[in-house]
């Protein structure tokens, strides 16, 4: 739970937009301008990659860049790939990115297997991790709108002498009281090794998904750890046909210096 951002096209208005956009961008501080440029580049690259894969895949919409999980898993024989990039608003040298595939195999229809490759950079110092994950659905009652699962994951640092960085246990519950509304509740436990400083903390999260239109869903969440991280995220999810979802979200920490960030992400399911 506690581990989940189009270039301009030339046309008749290109010269007009270029003349005005230069002045608009210059109004932004350099750090914000660089963060915005990185997010736009990532959106373009991600959508390009997803579009190529979508051409050879039979996909359905799902997935996202949020922390709070739901109680659903992929249908047997289906997979998804999530990619996201997050940049801090006031610290251009602090950013995170992740690529996370997951599949449910027909031979084990109640288990979703996945892994995430993530890169975090803080003040110029970076760390890369790989996170194997498994999620077992233990309850699915469509007539009641209830789904319940158990998810476990491990965190292994690839560029440290001591690779094991911790593990997570999370129990996500989803209730769908109305056709357009889904409510998510998470409860779990986290073990962080942190270079010898071992910590054990309870984790929690709440979230909602409200589908405003066929192509648009609004999502919000609040999550945290006992004595640790506390934050919220919210934003729209754009459904591009049957193949791709794109997330645009803002987030803010509720502790310390109350850092703010912008995240862009894309999901493909096939």
Indicate where each model-derived feature is located.
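Cleavable N-terminal export/targeting peptides
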Residues: 1-65
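Transmembrane beta-barrel domains of Gram-negative outer membranes and organellar outer membranes
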Residues: 59-270
């Amino acid at each position: 739970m506690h581990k989940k951002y189009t270039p301009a096209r030339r046309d008749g208005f290109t010269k007009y937009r270029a003349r005005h956009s230069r002045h608009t961008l210059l109004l932004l501080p350099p750090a914000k301008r660089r963060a915005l440029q990185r997010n736009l580049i990532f959106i373009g690259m991600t959508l390009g990659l997803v579009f190529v894969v979508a051409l050879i895949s039979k996909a359905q919409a799902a997935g996202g860049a949020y922390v709070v999980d739901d109680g659903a898993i992929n249908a047997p024989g289906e997979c998804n790939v999530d990619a996201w990039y997050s940049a801090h608003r006031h610290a251009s040298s602090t950013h995170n990115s992740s690529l996370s595939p997951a599949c449910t195999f027909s031979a084990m229809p109640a288990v979703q297997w996945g892994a995430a490759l993530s890169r975090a950079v803080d003040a110029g110092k970076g760390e890369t991790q790989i996170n194997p994950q498994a999620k077992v659905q233990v309850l699915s009652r469509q007539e009641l709108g209830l789904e319940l699962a158990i998810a476990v994951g491990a965190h292994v640092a690839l560029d440290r002498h001591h690779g094991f960085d911790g593990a997570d246990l999370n129990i996500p519950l989803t209730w769908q009281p109305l056709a357009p509304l889904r409510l998510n509740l998470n409860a779990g436990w986290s073990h962080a090794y942190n270079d010898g400083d071992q910590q054990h903390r309870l984790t929690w999260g709440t979230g909602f998904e409200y589908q405003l239109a066929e192509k648009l869903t609004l999502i919000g969440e609040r999550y945290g750890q006992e004595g640790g991280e506390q934050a919220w995220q919210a934003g729209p999810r754009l459904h591009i046909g049957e193949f791709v979802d794109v997330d645009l979200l803002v987030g803010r920490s509720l502790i310390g210096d109350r850092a703010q960030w912008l995240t862009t992400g894309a999901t493909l399911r096939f």
